[in-house]
Swiss-Prot record:
Presence of the UniProt keyword Oxidoreductase in the record: no
Protein origin, superkingdom: Bacteria
Binding sites annotated in the UniProt record for [4Fe-4S] cluster: C149, C152
Record's keyword annotation contains Amino-acid biosynthesis: no
Keywords (A to Z) from UniProt: 4Fe-4S, Iron, Iron-sulfur, Metal-binding
Designated name of the protein: Fe/S biogenesis protein NfuA
Length: 192
């Protein structure tokens, strides 16, 4: 469920040494499954352990995860990184905003998951996003661009060389193409 690097484990052991005996860490997600999802790590004293918590054992401590956060922490990783500016814990939880879907889930759910977890975070750097409108009977994903992508002069390249290529590679035999139905209006909101 959660991978904690050796460096991060050593850091937690050091921090927990100054806490009351039996204290572990808690990894959690606030507002899981939403665009506002935020992940965190806190101390978890023995009296804060809930009966439905999931306990993950590590070297010298345990990480407690509440039942509601667990599916959103699949494939999460915690690392302790040191560089010229100092040291910091990093927590990456790719499924915090949207629960990972099973490989046998309906095509529309799997495509929506890829859009929300992989494509939209890339487009967000330009203030843009896409939305899946429908999948046609011919297997074409009909998309609508929003934000900075609406009216952007690079939208055709983004669609064909980026999004379509990625989706066709991920869903061969199920998806035959992508189509943009956005009424593009170039304006100050447009990225380029």
């Amino acid at each position: 469920m959660i991978t904690i690097s050796d460096a991060a484990q050593a850091h937690f052991v050091k921090l927990l040494a100054d806490q009351p005996e039996g204290t572990h860490i808690r990894v959690f997600v606030i507002s899981p499954g939403t665009a506002q999802a935020e992940c965190g790590v806190s101390y978890c004293p023995p009296d804060a352990v809930e009966s439905d918590d999931i306990e993950l054992a590590f070297n010298g401590f345990s990480a407690m995860v509440d039942e509601k956060s667990a599916p959103f922490l699949e494939e999460a990783s915690i690392d302790f990184v040191t560089d010229q500016l100092g040291s910091q814990l990093t927590l990456k939880a790719p499924n915090a905003k949207m629960r990972k879907v099973a490989g046998d889930a309906p095509l529309v759910e799997r495509i929506e998951y890829v859009i929300q977890s992989e494509i939209n975070p890339q487009l967000a750097s330009h203030g843009g996003n896409i939305m899946l409108v429908e999948i046609t009977g011919e297997g074409v994903a009909v998309l609508q661009f929003g934000g900075g992508c609406n009216g952007c002069s690079q939208v055709d390249i983004t669609l064909k060389d980026g999004i379509e290529k990625q989706l066709l590679d991920m869903f061969p035999g199920e998806l035959t193409g992508v189509r943009d139905v956005t009424d593009h209006q170039h304006g100050e909101h447009s990225y380029a």
